[in-house]
Amino acid sequence: MKKSKKFGLIGKNIDYSFSKKYFSEKFKKENLDCTYSNFDVVNISEIESILQNNSISGYNVTIPYKEEIIKFLDEIDEVAKDIGAVNSIKKIDNKNIGFN
């Protein structure tokens, strides 16, 4: 049996965000076995433990962590390097790879 995929949003004070509702509805509409959670991070130091969770397939990143999160990632793509910010992270072979 295929395992449910987990995704989430990393940010601060993100209760206002439409992402959880949007992606949850999209997964249901597309009949995808996926969940989406908010990771409301008060302090940047919390991010490392969140990213170590290998059961989560990917994240969206919002303010104020788009730049600060880079130091916690294993790799970032060229666009993210050029911009100096990451807005999505994909877990590939237990590595966190940032994209923009």
Regions found by a protein language model. Name each.
Residues 2-100:
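Phosphate/diphosphate ligand-binding glycine-rich loop within oxidoreductases
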